Amino acid sequence: MTHVFIDGSAGTTGLRIADRLSERHDIALITLSEALRKDEKARKNALNSADIAFLCLPDAAATEAVGMVENPHTVVIDTSTAHRVHPEFAYGFPEIGSLREKIVSSHRIANPGCHASGFIAAVAPLVERNLLKKDAFLTCFSITGYSGGGKKMIAEYEADEKGAYAAPRQYGLSGNHKHLPEMQTVCGLAVQ
């Protein structure tokens, strides 16, 4: 039996992971009550009792959670952006280069970003085969569903009084989007 703890199980990502794993008979979910979800001691105990710990947390909280893991056998899978380019974390995109071997042998895995994944799947093979220069000027356009904004955005869309959400809203146009470092690093692109 594999014991799994989802730190951040009440958020959009955590709820989806819990839902999928709950149907597995070979997995036992370690859960914390509502009162203990943010209790550091309870979280630390759950993290270190788990065979696999999913971090479904904001970046700062994910970094804090990794610091709580003392059990060398606990596999940590972080869904935040905090560790996607961290050298001690394998980037969880097995179709790219030697990443499959790194994922299999690692106890620290960074889950790829959804928007970054589309870009990486298209660009990394082109860079790897020298069909696209590492310093090429690229743009990326993607659209997310409302669940991509998490619980806050879902609540805004489902509220009785809705804002003007008839068309997509622009986001991340400043050239420093949070997924940019992983897109550049995994694809082997030059930082501009």
How does the language model describe each region?
Residues 172-192:
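Oxyanion-binding "anion nests"
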